[in-house]
C-alpha cells in the first residue's frame, strides 16, 4: 500500500523536530516494509554555517540520520510498533559517493530486510538526480 505523508503526519510518527527533523515528506510507504522520503536541501540549513562556509556540503552523518528517520517511519508504521520510538541501533557498510549541496533534492529510500522482536535492519540509499549520494545498512531498536 502506497501512502503520502506530509510533515505533520511525519511528526505524529517520529519525535524529531526542527532543527533535527531531516525529512520533508514521505511519498511511498509500505507499512513495516519500506518507505521513500525527500529532504529539500537549502542554503539556509543550520549546518552549512560551519560545514563548510565557502563550499557548503551536507555532512554525511546527517544524510545517514535522514535515512534513519525515513526508516523509523517505515518500521513504526508496523501495527505492533505504532506509538513507540525507533532508536538508531547501528550502521554497517556505509558509503558516501556524491556531495549533497544546497539546491539538491535528496531522495531517501529504505527497505526493511529483517525484523525480529524489537530489532530491525534496513537497506538505505540516498540519491540526488538518480545518482547515489550515500548508502548503508541501518539497524533499529524499538523502545517504549
Curated annotation (Swiss-Prot):
Q: What Pfam families does this protein map onto?
A: FabA (PF07977)
Active site per the UniProt annotation: 51
Main subcellular location? cytoplasm
- Protein localization: Cytoplasm
Catalytic reactions on record: a (3R)-hydroxyacyl-[ACP] = a (2E)-enoyl-[ACP] + H2O
Give the top-rank taxon of the lineage listed in the UniProt record for this protein. Bacteria
One GO BP on record is:
lipid A biosynthetic process
Sorted alphabetically, which InterPro entries does this protein's record hold? Answer: FabA_FabZ, FabZ, HotDog_dom_sf
Q: What is its EC number?
A: 4.2.1.59
Keywords of this entry: Cytoplasm, Lipid A biosynthesis, Lipid biosynthesis, Lipid metabolism, Lyase
What's in the GO CC field?
cytoplasm; membrane
Single GO molecular function: (3R)-hydroxyacyl-[acyl-carrier-protein] dehydratase activity
Write out the transmembrane intervals: none
Give the protein's biological function.
Involved in unsaturated fatty acids biosynthesis. Catalyzes the dehydration of short chain beta-hydroxyacyl-ACPs and long chain saturated and unsaturated beta-hydroxyacyl-ACPs.
Sorted alphabetically, which PANTHER family does this protein's record hold? 3-HYDROXYACYL-[ACYL-CARRIER-PROTEIN] DEHYDRATASE
Family in the record: Belongs to the thioester dehydratase family. FabZ subfamily.
Name assigned to this protein = 3-hydroxyacyl-[acyl-carrier-protein] dehydratase FabZ
